[in-house]
Amino acid sequence: LIGFILKYAEKDTDIYKLACELSKEAYNYFKKNFPLESMHESACFVELYHYMKECSIFNLLDMEEFKKMLQKQIKQVITYDTKIWSTDYICKPSLFINSKSSDFYLENKEICDFEYQFILKTQNEDGSWGVTWEWNDYPEEWAISKNWWQSDIIIKNIKYIREFNL
């Protein structure tokens, strides 16, 4: 959300100034708690980095240090045991890297390219991909949510295939 505000809010507004302060707080939190355990929390910081870079905001944080720490963070949370990718709730590089021009692609090229091939190999005949997790404690909610998650996976996988067409 901070990145969105930095990108779209007018620079002379209070909300933009608040986003600048919150980005500093978030960065300090990241540094203090590095490395993070959560792939989702990690993805939020990668997204903040991308927004700031896209908007050429280089004066709020040490962007080079941020980039180096994020590179280590990404390597920390990606699941490299690819045998469980089809069956478990895991972290793939696409959570952080959505193009070959990403600052994080080259150091993760091999696993990104593997994911590309994995996506192609695991597509079902109907064009979808399976959801590899369940909400066992919430069967009624899962019956609905599984379709939503499957749609999300389809969209993300098609975008990944298009971007990483090897």
Annotate each PLM feature.
Residues 2-166:
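Preference for long, amphipathic alpha-helical scaffolds in soluble/luminal domains
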